[in-house]
Amino acid sequence: MNQGIIRDALKAKYKGDLAEAEANIRVYLSNPVGIGEHSDIIGAINEQVEKAVHAQDKLDYIKNLKW
């Protein structure tokens, strides 16, 4: 399989993971009362921040690889 295809697929996945975490954070911040299953808003946002940081770290890592 072409390395470029793999690299592009990984970038797309990590960008999607990052966008998902950022969207969740925006929802929690704009309407925390509407999220019934998350009584710990700080914990829920912290979890999404961790996901965002992890996705960004992966993006940075593959950008620096010698393909």
Task: Annotate each PLM feature.
Residues 2-67:
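Extended, charge-rich alpha-helical interface modules
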